[in-house]
UniProtKB/Swiss-Prot annotation:
Domain called MGS-like: residue spans: 1-148
SMART domains according to UniProt: AICARFT_IMPCHas (SM00798), MGS (SM00851)
A UniProt-annotated Pfam family: AICARFT_IMPCHas
Annotated protein name in UniProt: Bifunctional purine biosynthesis protein PurH
NCBIfam families: PRK00881.1, purH
Family per similarity comment: Belongs to the PurH family.
UniProt GO molecular function: IMP cyclohydrolase activity; phosphoribosylaminoimidazolecarboxamide formyltransferase activity
Record comment regarding domains: The IMP cyclohydrolase activity resides in the N-terminal region.
The gene coding this protein: purH
This protein's pathway: Purine metabolism; IMP biosynthesis via de novo pathway; 5-formamido-1-(5-phospho-D-ribosyl)imidazole-4-carboxamide from 5-amino-1-(5-phospho-D-ribosyl)imidazole-4-carboxamide (10-formyl THF route): step 1/1; Purine metabolism; IMP biosynthesis via de novo pathway; IMP from 5-formamido-1-(5-phospho-D-ribosyl)imidazole-4-carboxamide: step 1/1
Lineage, uppermost ranks: Bacteria, Pseudomonadati, Pseudomonadota, Gammaproteobacteria, Aeromonadales
GO cellular component, one term: cytosol
Length: 530
């Protein structure tokens, strides 16, 4: 039988006071004596709850503007004392056992995120007593419960009610894990912040920002699900998410129906969703093996889907489909009646769409919510023995960023298609070539070791599906090192090219475009994707 420990005395000291008053009232109603500090003690006292200030309990006042409050043997002895084994020494020094510690920490992350935050501001929001109590209680979880999340308050009360005001060892252990996760994340944030600073005391400075990248990199992710396997069936895998996953992301999406998401499902769905976010008009992106195989905009979602599917129906089989508008019934019905699909994701899903997809119970239907402007963050790539960290590729060009380098000027229709095509190319594996016309991909050449072969493949794809390349535009994710890619595009019927430029042979490539009567624009921005 599990060893349950009664809760008779609790120490409450929280920065985030969400739900703490209700929790304290519930503890008091169950006969738990309350110890507290500072603002938490005042909140409880003002609500009429019987609470003992830690300074009264220890006989030692808070000092140094609150820097020293709970760092006292009567506090930590009460938390760390092993029941039965340390009872005599605790009695000798008048140390009362503390059975539960309820603590969350100074808002360091919120403080350093504020505009104009100084190093001094950050330093004063480094919690010392809080993490010490959390770690003490977590270490002694055999006898003490540690609660660091407001989400656990109700759970604790329910178990106390069903267990004679006691908590089981399994619960205390689970709470201890959460506590160590909490302090690890907290210390990681502080280390990341300080790791970007170079102390330059003496020039009326307290620190200079040296780099976006700290000396050591600390980041915490929370396991969202275990998976049957990873990229391949012999690889174990799990999916982890940021604690505050961005709205409108795969990590924050809700699965409405279908089988459990696989490792490859999640990777491909992320690729599709991030691509479709680039478009303002109703858009559809179909992805296979992390590459867009069909992308289109339309007057509505149904027309966007029909045109995206038309690009490459063969590759669309078993693909991932993403939309940037609410999924409606007509579009959902067209998908499930036409093709086998692994995942459909949209910001919202209408009831009619849910009903239509329900006919295919294995289809994974996800609702990701509305997204906001993308926040700068980091992307990671694991290498053997190390980690590559870079800023997310949020770059995108507008018409004002483009430079016409050819003799021929693009038409307005070509300009619109060039921007559409460039948005797609950003999400195609390098070397990436995309053909497009009238807001629809015509052919996609992805992942080839030479750029000219990507161009040839895009043309072959279009021909195989009976699509007309003549009059289409082409986007290349990086510069053309030779003119051969332009010659191949011209032979296929491409009229206009958008590319970053920057090759030693740019003039040779521009001359090729002029020879073929094509127009060419430089973006001065590359979009490699590996």
């Amino acid at each position: 039988m599990e060893q349950a420990r009664p809760i008779r005395r609790a120490l409450l000291s929280v920065s985030d006071k969400t739900g703490i008053l209700e929790f304290a009232k519930a503890l008091n109603e169950r006969g738990v004596a309350l110890l507290s500090t500072g603002g938490t003690a005042k909140l409880l006292a003002d609500a009429g709850l019987p609470v003992t200030e830690v300074s009264d309990y220890t006989g030692f006042p808070e000092m140094m503007d609150g820097r020293v409050k709970t760092l006292h043997p009567k506090v930590h002895g009460g938390i760390l004392g092993r029941r039965e084994q340390d009872d005599a020494i605790m009695a000798q020094h008048a140390i009362s056992p503390i059975d539960m510690v309820v603590v969350n920490l100074y808002p360091f992350a919120a403080t350093v995120a504020k505009p104009g935050c100084t190093l001094a501001d950050a330093v004063e929001n480094i919690d010392i007593g809080g993490p010490t109590m959390v770690r003490s209680a977590a270490k002694n979880h055999k006898d003490v419960a540690i609660v660091v999340k407001a989400a656990d308050y109700d759970r604790v009360i329910r178990e106390m009610d069903g267990n004679g005001n006691s908590l089981k060892l399994a619960t205390r252990f689970d709470l201890a894990i959460a506590a160590f996760e909490h302090t690890a994340a907290y210390d990681g944030m502080i280390a990341n912040y300080f790791g970007t600073m170079v102390p330059s005391y003496g020039d009326n400075k307290e620190g200079d920002e040296e780099s976006r990248f700290p000396r050591t990199f600390n980041s915490q992710f929370i396991k969202k699900q275990d998976m049957r396997y990873g990229e391949n069936s012999h690889q174990a895998a799990a999916f982890y998410a940021e604690e505050q996953a961005a709205p409108g992301s795969v990590a924050s999406a809700i699965q409405l129906q279908g089988k459990a998401l696989s490792y490859n499902n999640i990777a491909d769905t992320d690729a599709a969703l991030e691509c479709v976010k680039e478009f303002d008009q109703p858009a559809c992106v179909i992805v296979k093996h992390a590459n867009p195989c069909g992308v289109a905009i339309g007057s509505d979602l149904l027309s966007a889907y029909e045109r995206a599917w038309q690009t490459d129906p063969t590759s669309a089989f078993g693909g991932i489909i993403a939309f940037n508008r609410e999924l409606d019934g007509a579009t959902a019905k067209a998908i499930v009646e036409r093709q086998f699909v692994e995942v459909i994701i949209a910001p919202t899903v209408s009831q009619a769409a849910r009903d239509a997809v329900a006919a295919k119970q294995n289809v994974r239907l996800l609702e990701c919510g509305q997204w906001t402007a993308p926040a700068q963050g980091f992307d990671f790539k694991r290498v053997n023995g190390g980690l590559l960290v870079q800023e997310r590729d949020l770059g995108m060009v507008t018409l004002g960023d483009l430079t016409v380098v050819s003799k021929r000027q693009p038409t307005e229709a070509e300009l619109n298609d060039l921007l559409f095509c460039w948005k797609v190319a950003k999400f195609v594996k390098s070397n990436a070539i995309v053909y497009a016309k009238d807001g629809q991909t015509i052919g996609v050449g992805a992942g080839q070791m030479s750029r000219v072969y990507s161009a040839k493949i895009a043309g072959i794809k279009a021909e195989d599906e009976g699509l007309t390349v003549a009059g289409s535009v082409m986007a290349s994710d990086a510069f053309f090192p030779f003119r051969d890619g332009i010659d191949a595009a011209a032979a296929a019927g491409i009229s206009c090219v958008i590319q970053p430029g920057g090759s030693m042979r740019d003039q040779e490539v521009i001359d090729a475009a002029d020879e073929h009567g094509m127009c060419m624009l430089f973006t001065n921005m590359r979009h490699f994707r590996h």
